[in-house]
């Protein structure tokens, strides 16, 4: 939802913005502005990692596994996947051209270089940034920006030694970015220490929502609010990792 809303906002401001799905099609309650084809299709990258002979399967068959409809069906329970079972795959993806998904790295980078030729590329997290070294080599003029958001929740569930190795690799990739965007100073500083990043290079961009749909909303019930009272709106999942309970307590 956030990625789709961000792409919409950039387009409204006149930016030539492409929202490119990785792993699975974009899932959103609103109209999607994402491109229809998927790179690093979730089924393909899993089979490339777990079944060595799969790399010899003809490309046209692999593309069938990247069809949005099939991916949406095959990954409908992806949110319940235990990170503890994905240690090898995580490290392989972070290894980029040295990983088991090297052919997917080559395919994505060639598409960016030959067809898109972007001025800037925004990674919505560093867990998908294994392609950065290849992009740096093939598109040296492109600015690379990554958002740190939620990476810690996934890393926390990786068992040792996968967690430490993944953190080290993510730190290396982050240091190759032109900028790292964070939604809060505290989170940014915490992740900078964890990943070995320079906190001075972090750019703060607080989370927001599009209020346009609510501007004409009239509540059914009006409540008296004492002068000077502060009201806080919370628009997110109610989950421990969001920290709402800390605010309430």
State each model region's role.
Residues 1, 190, 242-249:
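Active-site helix-initiating loop/hinge in glycosyltransferases
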Residues 19-110:
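A conserved catalytic-core segment of Leloir-type glycosyltransferases
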Residues 109-113, 117, 162-180:
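Membrane-proximal helix-turn-helix segments that form the acceptor-binding/catalytic region
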Residues 120-122, 135-154:
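Active-site proximal beta-strand in glycosyltransferases
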Residues 124-128:
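Short His-centered aromatic/hydrophobic patch
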Residues 156-158, 193, 209-228:
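Acidic anion/phosphate-binding donor-loop and adjacent secondary structure
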Residues 186, 208:
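Carbohydrate-associated surface elements
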Residues 223-242, 248:
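Conserved donor-binding/catalytic core segment of Leloir-type glycosyltransferases
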């Amino acid at each position: 939802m956030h990625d789709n809303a961000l792409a919409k906002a950039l387009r409204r401001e006149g930016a030539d913005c492409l929202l490119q799905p990785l792993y699975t099609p974009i899932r959103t309650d609103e109209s999607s502005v994402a491109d229809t084809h998927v790179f690093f299709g979730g089924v393909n990258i899993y089979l490339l990692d777990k079944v060595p002979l799969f790399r010899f399967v003809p490309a046209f068959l692999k593309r069938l596994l990247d069809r949005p409809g099939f991916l949406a069906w095959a990954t409908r329970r992806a949110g319940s996947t235990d990170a503890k079972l994905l240690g090898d795959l995580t490290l392989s993806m972070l290894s980029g051209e040295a990983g088991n998904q090297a052919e997917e790295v080559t395919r994505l980078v060639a598409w960016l270089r030959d067809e898109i030729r972007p001025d800037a590329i925004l990674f919505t997290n560093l867990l998908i940034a294994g392609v950065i070294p290849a992009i740096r080599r093939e598109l040296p003029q492109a600015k690379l920006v990554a958002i740190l958001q939620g990476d810690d929740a996934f890393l926390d569930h990786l068992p040792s030694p996968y967690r430490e190795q993944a953190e080290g690799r993510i730190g290396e990739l982050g240091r190759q970015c032109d900028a790292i965007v964070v939604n809060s100073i505290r989170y940014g500083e915490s992740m900078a220490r964890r990943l070995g990043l320079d906190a001075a290079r972090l750019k703060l961009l607080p989370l927001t929502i599009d209020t346009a749909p609510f501007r004409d909303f009239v509540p059914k019930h009006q409540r008296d609010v004492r002068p000077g009272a502060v009201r806080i709106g919370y628009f997110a999942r109610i989950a421990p990792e969001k920290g709402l309970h800390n605010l309430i307590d």
